[in-house]
């Protein structure tokens, strides 16, 4: 069995560390604006990196499900790490499986995360991914963390 992994940790000082392997992704938005995301450890991401196909073409590529590394294999998986110092009010982190991100653009997800609460955004993204996959999608897993101002 193969496992995809994406994880983030926010320490009490507000710093964020993330680690990623496979094709689950972590996205960082600030006030709905796309800031950064992880890159998949997949065959099509390798083709994108080489300039052989575009990111848009990768989404519909017939070999988009081939992973170059993930947890649960005999070889050591690739792990990418990233550090975000001092998250701020308006920052939002989304960790999700390919069954979610495959059906949205980065900007579309940012808009949903900006205008809805974390719970409402999670429900909307899951429901919309189910609809768009027409019953043929992958697993749907996600976690949303939004930094909102404290009530005074």
Predicted segment positions?
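A generic local secondary-structure boundary/capping motif
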Residues: 6-7, 15-17, 55-58, 82-85, ...
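Internal active-site segments that recognize and position negatively charged phosphoryl groups
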Residues: 12-17, 21, 27-28, 34, ...
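Short, small-residue-biased leader/transition segments that mark boundaries at the very start
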Residues: 1-2
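A short local loop/turn or secondary-structure capping micro-motif enriched for an aromatic residue
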Residues: 25-28, 43-46, 103
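Short hydrophobic alpha-helical segments used for membrane anchoring or interfacial signaling
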Residues: 7-12, 28-29, 143-148
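C-terminal catalytic subdomain
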Residues: 65, 69-96, 100-152
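ATP/adenylate-binding site constellation spanning eukaryotic-like Ser/Thr protein kinases
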Residues: 21, 31, 40, 64, ...
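Glycine-rich phosphate-binding loop plus the immediately following alpha-helix
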Residues: 33-71
């Amino acid at each position: 069995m193969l496992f995809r992994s994406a994880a983030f940790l926010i320490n009490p000082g507000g710093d964020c560390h993330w680690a990623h392997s496979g094709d689950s992704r972590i996205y960082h938005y600030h006030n709905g604006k796309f800031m950064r995301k992880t890159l998949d450890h997949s065959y099509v991401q390798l083709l994108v990196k080489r300039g052989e196909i575009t990111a848009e073409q990768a989404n519909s590529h017939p070999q988009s499900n081939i992973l170059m590394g993930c947890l649960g294999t005999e070889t050591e998986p690739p792990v990418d790490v990233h550090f975000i110092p001092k998250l701020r009010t308006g920052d939002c982190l989304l960790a999700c499986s390919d069954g979610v991100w495959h059906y949205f653009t980065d900007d579309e997800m940012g808009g949903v995360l900006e205008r809805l609460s974390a719970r409402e955004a999670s429900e909307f993204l899951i429901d919309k991914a189910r609809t768009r996959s027409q019953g043929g999608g992958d697993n749907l897993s996600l976690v949303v963390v939004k930094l909102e101002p404290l009530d005074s």
